[in-house]
Amino acid sequence: MDLIEKLAAIEEIKALKARYWRGVDSKDLELLRSVFADEDCEIDMRNPTGPGTGGAVVHDPDAFSKNCLRALADYTTAHHGHNPEIDILSPTEATGNWPMEDRLWLIDGAKGVGFEYLHGWGNYHDRYRKTDKGWKISFTNLQRSRVDKR
């Protein structure tokens, strides 16, 4: 790949990750599911809201997308990724590290999943694969560095 092709791939991957967060925050199941590879996909969300909070490693993007939005249904959410480090390994493979910050607010009158408010920081460690449908997330892992919640 020449420099222009690599830069184009990086921009496509940035847009892909932006769609991931928009899918989560807008509770758009179809959009969220569309960012993941159909085959050989691993979503590692152990300790999603801090150490000791459960979570799982999932290999089914359909199940992950549904369960993610179900868990967040009682919350207004805002997720942001900043200053990604994206490495294009080949014309069809790339990795990315995304510092992130998110906030979750319990909707008035809702039950939630054990907290009213969460403000978190961390990093997403991703792998991407280029498919006939464009770049897709083939692996993602959220590593939390700090979580404040009440």
PLM feature segments, named:
Residues L3, L7, G55-V58, F115:
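Charge-dense, low-complexity intrinsically disordered segments
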Residues E11, N47, R146:
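Solvent-exposed, flexible loop/coil residues
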Residues L29-D102:
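A solvent-exposed, acidic/Ser-Thr-rich amphipathic alpha-helical stretch
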Residues I4, A73-R150:
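A beta-strand edge to alpha-helix "cap/lid" segment located at domain peripheries
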Residues M1-S26, E30-D38:
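Short, low-complexity N-terminal intrinsically disordered segments enriched in polar/charged residues
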